[in-house]
Amino acid sequence: NEYWKKKIPKKIIGDIKQIDIYKNGRLQIIFRTEDKFYVLDRNGNEVKELSFEIDSGENNIPISIFDYEKNRNYRFLVTNDNIIEMFDSRGKKVSGFKPNTFESIIIKSPVHIRIDGKDFIIIQLENGELKILDRRGRDRIDIDEKIQFSENSIYSYMKTFTTTDNQGYLV
């Protein structure tokens, strides 16, 4: 049975996610296209006050959703080419987050990892740089070594970070 369908004018980038923005037990659907962040209610209607236009780039990657305190105060990281911005669940830019423009294109959705109460936002760049930021967008750890990233994401492992390079080595 088809419950509803909706025509989206541009291709959806990444997975469609469900979250409870209103904290009422009813899930909303969120996703992005090259130039818009969408929030749809459970009936497929666009929640216009929460959907917003975003700058489009040539290398648009899926949004990242962070819920730092697990209290449904969501943060959305939107990237375009080499720029990263953070929005709150009302579609407003987070004033405490410093938008970043990197020297190279972002190649994967940013990842949030918490270790010993500290938040790390991890970003992989096309030039092999690994950027590790705090929750305000400032550099938390400087990494000098370049990595030829594989398709794998970055994970927390024994209070550190791990991924694989394109040769299959754990780094």
Whereabouts are the PLM-identified features?
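Extracytoplasmic/lumenal domain signature
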Residues: 1-171
